[in-house]
């Protein structure tokens, strides 16, 4: 009988612990939002210097982009329109920002947030179609 009486307390404690974890993760994601917004807006802004924008790319994305030409030559050729950041979602070490009519995906690195994909358009249930992306 004591076991049954103790179980509700265990469940409540477990729920409180899980709730605390969710609150902790939500706090981390909201703290990251301004940085994600700043990086996404700068990368999508065609008036920002190409080298500064290239520095915002994740290493594998930079490598993929430079298969055809140097990043500083490639970025000005792409149809970036810039615009206001309309929304930001952060989860774990990843983020998504909607800038103007585009979607930007980012990853958190030791050096801060880096762009993994940009100039992305949704395709319903299929993965986004991105003009800039890593492997």
Protein language model features and the residues they cover:
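Bacterial signal peptide processing site
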Residues: 29-31
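Exposed beta-strand-loop-beta-strand "reactive/processing" segments of non-cytosolic proteins
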Residues: 80-106
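Short, intrinsically disordered, charge-biased short linear motifs at domain edges
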Residues: 13-15, 40-42, 55-61, 107-108, ...
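Short beta-strand edge/turn micro-motifs at domain boundaries
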Residues: 103-134
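Short solvent-exposed beta->alpha transition segments
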Residues: 34-41, 45-89
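Sec-dependent bacterial lipoprotein signal peptides
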Residues: 1-26
């Amino acid at each position: 009988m004591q076991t049954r009486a103790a179980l509700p307390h265990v469940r409540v404690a477990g729920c409180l612990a899980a709730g605390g974890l969710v609150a902790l993760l939500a706090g981390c994601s909201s703290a990251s939002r301004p940085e994600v917004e700043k990086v996404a807006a700068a990368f999508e802004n065609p008036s920002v210097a190409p080298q500064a924008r290239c520095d915002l790319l994740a290493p594998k994305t930079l490598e993929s982009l430079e298969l055809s030409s140097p990043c500083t030559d490639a970025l000005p050729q792409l149809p970036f329109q810039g615009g206001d950041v309309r929304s930001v979602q952060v989860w774990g070490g990843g983020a998504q920002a909607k800038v103007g009519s585009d979607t930007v995906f980012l990853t958190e690195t030791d050096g801060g947030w880096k762009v993994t994909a940009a100039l992305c358009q949704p395709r319903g249930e299929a993965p986004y179609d991105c003009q800039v992306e890593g492997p």
